[in-house]
């Protein structure tokens, strides 16, 4: 007889061996995602060995996300952007610890090229220290570059928040001095484009194109500059260069 289940997430048959007096679980499981009746496997033996399938069901449970604790790491974590590529973890730590107690600092590097991605994070020991770092360092110049410093406010998600991406798109400043950037890796953000292209000229704005209504990258973007000279310099220097492990295409938009 078929058996019906309610709110079943998966059916996980577990194989037990009857070769000894005690059952020995072999840990073979099969996930079944279906609301339809499933045939009972109990009492089924294979011909080659005395193996029995004993199905059991796992019911669904809901977990509510915990509210962000002001003292959590996310509230104490500071984003530091537009830093020179030469800045190391040690140098960034020295810069930050002048304004508060530091728990850890990490400069982010491209996993393929090994080059700095021009930004990093500093986790402070208190929210007050994190706020002090933002107040004292945001807008400061480090080796000729104006750095951007702000509280991350929430843990870095595996996929960007859609409302944030839509806001970024609406904030894009168009210009006749614009380049198209193609063959972008799915992980590339507008900040990465800004950091990369600012090496070759004054970047006005940048954006990564997204599939409408989603956070999924379409694999291309745009960068605007303040002059035609900057456009030409960016194309010559960055066309076919590596970004997040992929060769990008750069040409006039």
From Swiss-Prot:
Q: What is this protein called?
A: Small ribosomal subunit protein cS22
State which gene encodes it. PSRP2
Q: Which InterPro entries match?
A: Euk_RNA-bind_prot, Nucleotide-bd_a/b_plait_sf, RBD_domain_sf, RRM_dom
Summarize induction of expression: Down-regulated under cold, salt and dehydration stress conditions.
Signal sequence residues: none
Q: Where's it mainly located? A: plastid
* Annotated SUPFAM superfamilies: RNA-binding domain, RBD (SSF54928)
Listed PANTHER family = OS02G0815200 PROTEIN (PTHR48025), SMALL RIBOSOMAL SUBUNIT PROTEIN CS22 (PTHR48025:SF4)
Q: Which Pfam families match?
A: RRM_1
Q: Enumerate the UniProt keywords alphabetically.
A: Chaperone, Chloroplast, DNA-binding, Plastid, Repeat, Ribonucleoprotein, Ribosomal protein, RNA-binding, rRNA-binding, Stress response, Transit peptide
Q: How does it assemble?
A: Component of the chloroplast small ribosomal subunit (SSU). Mature 70S chloroplast ribosomes of higher plants consist of a small (30S) and a large (50S) subunit. The 30S small subunit contains 1 molecule of ribosomal RNA (16S rRNA) and 24 different proteins. The 50S large subunit contains 3 rRNA molecules (23S, 5S and 4.5S rRNA) and 33 different proteins.
Biological function = Component of the chloroplast ribosome (chloro-ribosome), a dedicated translation machinery responsible for the synthesis of chloroplast genome-encoded proteins, including proteins of the transcription and translation machinery and components of the photosynthetic apparatus. May have a role in the recruitment of stored chloroplast mRNAs for active protein synthesis. Bind single strand DNA (ssDNA) and RNA in vitro. Exhibits RNA chaperone activity. Negatively regulates resistance responses to abiotic stresses during seed germination (e.g.
Gene Ontology BP annotations? negative regulation of response to salt stress; negative regulation of response to water deprivation; regulation of seed germination; regulation of seedling development; response to cold; response to salt stress; response to water deprivation
Query: Which GO molecular function terms does the record list?
Result: mRNA binding; RNA binding; rRNA binding; single-stranded DNA binding
* Tissue expression remark: Expressed constitutively in roots, stems, flower buds, flowers and leaves.
- Species for this entry: Arabidopsis thaliana
Tell me the ranges covered by the RRM domain, including all copies: 76-154, 177-253
Stated family: Belongs to the chloroplast-specific ribosomal protein cS22 family.
């Amino acid at each position: 007889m078929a058996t019906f289940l309610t709110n079943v997430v998966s059916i996980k048959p577990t194989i037990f061996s009857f070769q000894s007096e005690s059952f020995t679980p072999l840990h073979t499981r099969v996930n079944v995602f279906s609301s339809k009746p499933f045939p009972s496997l109990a009492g089924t033996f294979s011909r080659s060995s005395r193996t029995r399938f004993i199905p059991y069901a796992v019911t669904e449970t809901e977990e509510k996300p915990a509210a962000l604790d002001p003292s959590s790491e996310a509230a104490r974590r500071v984003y530091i952007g537009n830093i020179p590529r030469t800045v190391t973890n040690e140098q960034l730590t020295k810069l930050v610890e002048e304004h508060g107690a530091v728990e850890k600092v990490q400069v982010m590097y491209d996993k393929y090229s090994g080059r700095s991605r021009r930004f990093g994070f500093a986790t402070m020991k208190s929210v007050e220290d994190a706020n002090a770092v933002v107040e004292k360092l945001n807008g400061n110049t480090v080796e000729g570059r104006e750095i951007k410093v702000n509280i991350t406010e929430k843990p870095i998600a595996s996929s960007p928040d859609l409302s944030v991406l839509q806001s970024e798109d609406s904030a894009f400043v168009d210009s006749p001095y614009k380049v198209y950037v193609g063959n972008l890796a799915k992980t590339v953000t507008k900040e990465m484009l800004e950091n990369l292209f600012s090496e070759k000229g004054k970047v006005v704005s940048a954006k990564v194109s997204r599939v409408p209504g989603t956070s999924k990258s379409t694999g291309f973007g745009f960068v605007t500059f303040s002059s035609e000279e900057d456009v030409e310099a960016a194309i010559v220097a960055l066309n076919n260069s590596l970004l997040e492990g992929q060769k990008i295409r750069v040409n006039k938009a």
